Amino acid sequence: MLDIVLYQPEIPPNTGNIIRLCANTGYRLHLIEPLGFEWDDKRVKRAGLDYHEFAEVKRWPNFEAFLEAVAPTRVFACTTKGRTAHSAVQFAAGDALLFGPESRGLPIEIIESLPFEQRLRIPMLPQSRSMNLANAVAVFVYESWRQLGYAGSLQE
């Protein structure tokens, strides 16, 4: 499976929804601190319902600690600043999908540290700025999982 990495997420219900998404797909969730909310915020739990126990969630003090411990094969910056469509890449087990905080996106230093082909975006109309974080994560997760044949799902 792949790893979902939320860099300094700010909105508890988004993180809760992503926890539920990970529980349903088997993807692992990594949260890069500082979080913009308390981990025990009831809005995180409410959005994730009773799926928290079925999701693998880890917190990291910084992005470097995540990279060192997990050592993903490739890291993809999922950003409005990307040039490659999310569906134009062949994902593989061991990849990590990195998303920035809701209000400001990923730091430019992180984006620029990755090769151009690993800076991905979801196609949108020109007048649109961005998508909701939980929705964007779901788009990436289901595209990558589709490419992997929905490994581990009930459809197998």
From Swiss-Prot:
Where in the cell does this protein reside? Cytoplasm
Which Enzyme Commission number(s) are on file for it? 2.1.1.207
Principal localization reads cytoplasm
**Subunit-structure text:** Homodimer.
InterPro entries given in the database record: Alpha/beta_knot_MTases (IPR029028), SpoU_MeTrfase (IPR001537), TrmL (IPR016914), tRNA_m1G_MTases_N (IPR029026)
The UniProt keyword set, sorted, is: Cytoplasm, Methyltransferase, S-adenosyl-L-methionine, Transferase, tRNA processing
PANTHER family referenced in this protein's UniProt entry, alphabetically: TRNA (CYTIDINE(34)-2'-O)-METHYLTRANSFERASE
Protein function: Methylates the ribose at the nucleotide 34 wobble position in the two leucyl isoacceptors tRNA(Leu)(CmAA) and tRNA(Leu)(cmnm5UmAA). Catalyzes the methyl transfer from S-adenosyl-L-methionine to the 2'-OH of the wobble nucleotide.
Q: Name one GO cellular component term.
A: cytoplasm
Molecular function (GO) terms for this protein are: RNA binding; tRNA (5-carboxymethylaminomethyluridine(34)-2'-O)-methyltransferase activity; tRNA (cytidine(34)-2'-O)-methyltransferase activity
**UniProt GO BP:** wobble position cytosine ribose methylation; wobble position uridine ribose methylation
Q: Which domain of life is it from?
A: Bacteria
Q: What is this protein called?
A: tRNA (cytidine(34)-2'-O)-methyltransferase
Q: Which family does it belong to?
A: Belongs to the class IV-like SAM-binding methyltransferase superfamily. RNA methyltransferase TrmH family. TrmL subfamily.
UniProt catalytic activity: cytidine(34) in tRNA + S-adenosyl-L-methionine = 2'-O-methylcytidine(34) in tRNA + S-adenosyl-L-homocysteine + H(+); 5-carboxymethylaminomethyluridine(34) in tRNA(Leu) + S-adenosyl-L-methionine = 5-carboxymethylaminomethyl-2'-O-methyluridine(34) in tRNA(Leu) + S-adenosyl-L-homocysteine + H(+)
Q: Which Pfam families match?
A: SpoU_methylase
- Enumerate the residues binding S-adenosyl-L-methionine: G100, I122, S130
Give, as one word, the top-level EC class.
transferase
